[in-house]
Swiss-Prot record:
Cellular component GO terms, alphabetical: plasma membrane
Protein name as annotated: Uncharacterized protein YqzF
Gene that produces this protein: yqzF
Classification via InterPro entries: Uncharacterised_YqzF
Membrane-topology descriptor: Multi-pass membrane protein
Location(s) in or outside the cell: Cell membrane
Taxonomic superkingdom: Bacteria
Amino acid sequence: MSRLLALLILVIPGAISALGIKLMRDTLFGHTIKPFSALWLQGLSGFIFFAIGLYVLAGFILYRDRKRNQVSPRFRKR
């Protein structure tokens, strides 16, 4: 059960990041998706989705590696 939960924790932010990359790519090529009225709004939303997904993924990996004591001294808790 815990492995399934860990997989979901990694897949959901990964999908959000992938959506962000897709929105930024569509903005670059000038394709507007339905809920967005302007390209700049679509590009900004894509960047925000990508940043949030990457933040959650990186935080989860750092938390897991800290727990296993596999990080460099600079990232260890004080």
